[in-house]
């Protein structure tokens, strides 16, 4: 018998994960954050101890995919910083720059 993790490993498209686990999604959200959602789901699953019962394990996977998806319905991939390239990027300082600093001629 194939376990849920083996089944998920055989999937390639993000939409397949959502269909397999029965999680509803907005195509616009998925088109922008598909890799981020799946990576976040993987992080959540790696922190969880899956139940030995197949139905319970499937429910856990479904819940973690839903949780990861929800993260990106409320935020953006850049703000969530799932991938190293985003984590290493310099965060905007949000500091104030006065108009006089922008218009000084160097004197």
Curated annotation (Swiss-Prot):
One of its GO terms (biological process) is nitrogen fixation. InterPro entries: NifW. It comes from the Bacteria. Pfam families: NifW. Keywords: Nitrogen fixation. The keyword DNA-binding does not apply. May protect the nitrogenase Fe-Mo protein from oxidative damage. Homotrimer; associates with NifD. Belongs to the NifW family. This is Nitrogenase-stabilizing/protective protein NifW. It comes from Gluconacetobacter diazotrophicus (strain ATCC 49037 / DSM 5601 / CCUG 37298 / CIP 103539 / LMG 7603 / PAl5).
